[in-house]
From Swiss-Prot:
One GO process term, biological-process aspect: viral transcription
Transmembrane segments: none
Any GO CC annotation of this UniProt entry: DNA-directed RNA polymerase complex
The species this protein was found in: Variola virus (isolate Human/India/Ind3/1967)
Keyword Transcription on entry: yes
Protein name stated in the entry: DNA-directed RNA polymerase 22 kDa subunit
Catalytic reactions of this protein: RNA(n) + a ribonucleoside 5'-triphosphate = RNA(n+1) + diphosphate
GO molecular function: DNA binding; DNA-directed RNA polymerase activity
Primary localisation category: virion
Job of this protein: Part of the DNA-dependent RNA polymerase which catalyzes the transcription of viral DNA into RNA using the four ribonucleoside triphosphates as substrates. Responsible for the transcription of early, intermediate and late genes. DNA-dependent RNA polymerase associates with the early transcription factor (ETF), itself composed of OPG118 and OPG133, thereby allowing the early genes transcription. Late transcription, and probably also intermediate transcription, require newly synthesized RNA polymerase.
The enzyme's E.C. designation: 2.7.7.6
């Protein structure tokens, strides 16, 4: 963990804060404009304070290396430690260091996406039904270890389908749905 990794991680945590506020918010890189971050870097534990610019809601994230986790909640705490790992692992709070080598969120390649609510999920599932009802079409899959799934995680709302938005010069906005599958241990 270094100061640059933590700076890039703070942008991801801004988006996680937006999901904590509204689990069905449309996520894109413009979400960063709603938040300010304060980073107190330390080799053992780094505190990242994310504050909403309008309502001043504050969330404090404690960031640890995977080798030295000593988590105790603080005021306005997120509720779980954020762990920087050496390789990709299950868990919404575990970010591999290779995710943090570049500023992923501000990149032009960062997608625009949203979690589907139960009504939208039911509509997608009904569209996937074939004529006889015995077979269903399947959506493309994405693993629960992908950064989009880690961002959209909420403990009380299961994530089954993620909708991505892509700009198209001819048709406007295209949508692409992907189903989330779990990774075996």
């Amino acid at each position: 963990m270094n100061q640059y990794n933590v700076k890039y991680l703070a942008k991801i945590l801004c988006i996680k804060t937006e999901i904590a506020r509204d689990p069905y918010a449309v996520i894109n890189r413009n979400v960063l404009l709603r938040y300010t971050t304060d980073i107190q870097y330390n080799d053992l534990v780094t505190l990242i304070t994310v504050r909403h610019k309008i309502d001043s809601m504050k969330t404090v994230f404690q960031v640890f290396n995977e080798s030295s986790i000593n988590y105790t909640p603080v005021d306005d705490d997120y509720g779980e430690p954020i762990i920087i790992t050496s390789y990709l692992q299950k868990g919404h709070n575990k970010f591999p260091v290779n995710f943090l080598y570049i500023d992923v969120v501000i990149s032009d390649l960062f997608p625009s996406f949203v979690r589907l609510n139960t009504t939208e999920t039911n509509i997608v599932n009904s569209v996937l039904q074939t004529g006889d009802g015995k077979k269903t079409l399947r959506l493309p899959k994405m693993l629960e270890t992908e950064i989009v799934v880690k961002i959209l995680y909420r403990p009380n709302i299961p994530l089954k389908i993620v909708r991505f938005f892509r700009n198209n010069m001819i048709t406007g906005v295209e949508i692409a749905d992907r189903s989330v599958i779990s990774v075996a241990d």
